[in-house]
Each structure stands twice: as C-alpha cells, then as structure tokens.
Curated annotation (Swiss-Prot):
Biological source species: Rattus norvegicus
Positions bound to substrate: 46, 199
Protein name: Lysosomal phospholipase A and acyltransferase
Gene (UniProt): Pla2g15
Residues the entry annotates as binding Zn(2+): 198, 355, 392
Cysteine pairings via disulfide bonds: 65-89
Native organism taxonomy: Eukaryota, Metazoa, Chordata, Craniata, Vertebrata
Catalytic activity: a 1,2-diacyl-sn-glycero-3-phosphocholine + H2O = a 2-acyl-sn-glycero-3-phosphocholine + a fatty acid + H(+); 1,2-dihexadecanoyl-sn-glycero-3-phosphocholine + H2O = 2-hexadecanoyl-sn-glycero-3-phosphocholine + hexadecanoate + H(+); 1-hexadecanoyl-2-(9Z-octadecenoyl)-sn-glycero-3-phosphocholine + H2O = 2-(9Z-octadecenoyl)-sn-glycero-3-phosphocholine + hexadecanoate + H(+); 1,2-di-(9Z-octadecenoyl)-sn-glycero-3-phosphocholine + H2O = 2-(9Z-octadecenoyl)-sn-glycero-3-phosphocholine + (9Z)-octadecenoate + H(+)
C-alpha cells in the first residue's frame, strides 16, 4: 500500500479517536461556571428602596383618602401621594406607631406594608416604579455592573428592607440576607462583595458584628461602604425638631415631621459619643442648648418623648469599637456644605439657621471617618477613598466610585 495513503489513514484514525475526546473537553469547559467575578449584594440606605402597602382601614384622616385597596400599591416612592391634602393620607399610612410596653413599632390599624423585590435590583434602582429620573438611585451603578458582565437578579442582587425600622425590628431580613449570601456563594463559586450606601452600612455592620469570623471569612470577600454614617448624623436633630422636606417645595417640614419622627431609624442615627465631643452643641435655642448628653431633655422639649425610648432601644445596636471583620473599603464625599449645627429663634416649630461643616451634604466628615479607627483593630485591610465634591446620593454614580468598585470586583490594577 502507498505509504502516503497509510499515513493519511493513520491520521484519520487518530482524528476519529481524538474528536470525541476533544468534544468532551469542550463540553466540560462549557459546563464550568463562566463566573470570573464575585457576586454582589447591594444594600440601600434610608428611604432607599420601594415600599408597598395594602389598606383596610377603620377610618381615614380625610375624605379623599382611600380606606380600602384590593391589592398592594406603591407607598414609597409615589410622587402623586406627596401632593397637598393627599400627603395627609400618605403620612397616615407610612407612619409607625411606637409601643412603649413592647418597645417595638406597629403599622397603623388597617395598613399592611411590605418590601418588594428582595433579591432583585428594581426596587432600589428606581424608587419610583415609573422610573422617573427624580427617583433614580442605584440605576447607574447597576447598569455599570451589567456592562462589566453581571446579570440583574443573578450575580448582582438587591437587599431592600423596611428602612423605617432599626435592625432590632428587622430580624427576618437578616436571616433572608444570610441565606441569599450563602446561596450566591454556592451558585457562583466564591464569596460575596457587599456594597452598601448610607444607613445600609449601619445595617451591614450590625449584621457582620453578629456573624462568626469563620462565616465572614468564607462568605464575604469585601465590604464596599459608600457615605456611611458610622457616628450618626448632625442633621438628624433638625429632622426630629422641625422636620426636613429635603428641599421639596410642595412638602411642608412640619407636615413631614410626624412621619420622620415615627421612624425609629431616625433616632438611631443621632450623633454618637464615640465620634463627637460631649461638649459640641448641635442645637442652639434662646432658652437652652443641646449636646449629645442632652437627648432626653431634647426629646422632652420637642414634645416627642417616644423618641427617647427609641434612642435607648437602638443606641447599642452596633459596637463602635468592633470592626466588621472583613476587607473594608470606605468611600466618602468631602467639600460639600453639610449641616453641622442649628440655631433656632422659635424652637422647635420654625426652620433653623444652619451652620455647615465638611462632608457630603448629609453625612458629616467626622462620622464617616470612624472607619479609620478600625485599621488597627482588624487583620483585614481597611482602605479609605475620598471623593472630593461628591454629594451623598450622587456618589453612587460618581465616576471615581464606579472605577474604584470595578477594581475591587475585577481586581484590575
């Protein structure tokens, strides 16, 4: 037989034997997870995700208010509910009722509130389901994550919660969060990166301080903290005293004050003595000044003594000196005038004059830099990144923020 034909037949034979093997190798490669980046959990801040409500109320505060609904509707954020007169209905539905005996809050009679979209991102991408720009929150960040290869509801998920309440009343949330993190670890073959904003950082600190170190080492790759109020926020005293409409002209500060006071998380975010001087005056009035040692008298003088009980219930929820025990990245805005103290001529029912300090417009620099203290208190790396001129909400879409996050997730230089 021609030697050339023999060689060809031998090659064909070997190819025939190799082809099934190569095919199996290719299929095996396809079966391997395509995941090359860590899964991400996004945790919003105060007011930072949608809430839904269903009504079956014994009475209403105005004849224009709905007494009963057949299904759940958007309670937050729905701009149509913030119109004059209608806002009275909204406040009566979204407020919490504090029980001094149980030291917990309840929904008003006939109101059921739920948090939509746990594990999804929609309820924190846009606070208003109509996706108006005014309600845009995590949208730009999630879009960036998608551009880096992530998929909504799969390897990037949201962890929304009832932000009116402090962690001590949201026990089921933390169980669900732990289960979701463990599930994502199993599905995507590695630990999770937590990305939290504002009060969401306090929620995550509470969560991490209660996890065994072995659990954190296995399931958490890093914690990216954006605008964290570690030491509380000075503007909280103004919110409690005279209300804060966040510059929304159709909402009167005194009108919104009832809802803001009823949220336990508001009192939880008062300034803490581990960050602020005991001598610092936050509120000046013609008859009295208030430091953080004067909270009891402050609540008495504004006519809201439930707030003092709320503060007592929540002030020990996170331990200032106990670090999270995971790799931590603290990003914070500077150079934006941030309320630091308040001067009232008519206390507490008139807007104050405001003295400003440094920060991101909401969180004071003194508070967010609390994470510096953890650099010497944990083995895991603690990194800080200043965002000059970055406002509290805008930092989520800040180019420096997104570039930093991309480096953490994709381990780019």
């Amino acid at each position: 037989m021609d030697r050339h034909l023999c060689i060809c037949r031998e090659i064909q034979l070997r190819s025939g034997l190799l082809f099934p093997f190569l095919l199996l190798m290719m299929l095996a490669d396809l079966a391997l997870p395509a995941q090359r980046h860590p899964p991400v959990v996004l945790v919003p801040g105060d007011l930072g995700n949608q809430l839904e409500a269903k009504l079956d109320k014994p009475k209403v505060v105005h004849y224009l208010c709905s007494k009963r609904t057949d299904s759940y509707f958007t309670l937050w954020l729905n701009l149509e509910l913030l119109l004059p007169v209608i806002i009275d209905c909204w406040i009566d539905n979204i407020r919490l009722v504090y029980n001094r005996t149980s030291r917990t809050t309840q929904f008003p009679d006939g109101v059921d509130v739920r948090v939509p979209g746990f594990g999804e991102t929609f309820s924190l991408e846009f606070l208003d389901p109509s996706k108006r720009n005014v309600g845009s929150y995590f949208y730009t960040m999630v879009e960036s994550l998608v551009g880096w290869g992530y998929t909504r509801g799969e390897d990037v998920r949201g962890a929304p919660y009832d932000w009116r309440r402090a962690p001590n009343e949201n026990g089921p949330y933390f169980l669900a969060l732990q289960e979701m993190i463990e599930e994502m670890y199993q599905m995507y073959g590695g630990p999770v990166v937590l990305v939290a904003h504002s009060m969401g950082n306090m929620y995550m600190l509470y969560f991490l301080q209660r996890q065994p170190q072995a659990w954190k080492d296995k399931y958490i790759q890093a914690f990216v903290s954006l605008g964290a109020p570690w030491g509380g926020v000075a503007k909280t005293l103004r919110v409690l005293a005279s209300g804060d409409n966040n510059r929304i002209p159709v909402i009167g500060p005194l009108k919104i004050r009832e809802q803001q006071r009823s949220a336990v998380s508001t009192s939880w975010l008062l300034p803490y003595n581990h960050t602020w001087s005991h001598e610092k005056v936050f509120v000046y009035t013609p008859t009295a000044n208030y430091t953080l040692r004067d909270y009891h008298r402050f609540f008495q003088d504004i006519g809201f003594e439930d707030g003092w009980f709320m503060r007592q219930d929540t002030q020990g929820l996170v331990e200032a000196l106990v670090p999270p025990g995971v790799e931590l990245h603290c990003l914070y805005g500077t150079g934006v005038p941030t309320p630091n103290s308040f001067y009232y001529e008519n206390f507490p029912d008139r807007d104050p004059k405001i003295c400003f300090g440094d920060g991101d417009g909401t969180v004071n620099l003194e508070s967010v830099l609390q994470c510096q203290a953890w650099q010497s208190r944990q083995e895991h790396k603690v990194s800080l990144q200043e965002l000059p001129g970055s406002e509290h909400i805008e930092m989520l879409a800040n180019a420096t923020t997104l570039a930093y996050l991309k480096r953490v997730l994709l381990e780019e230089p």
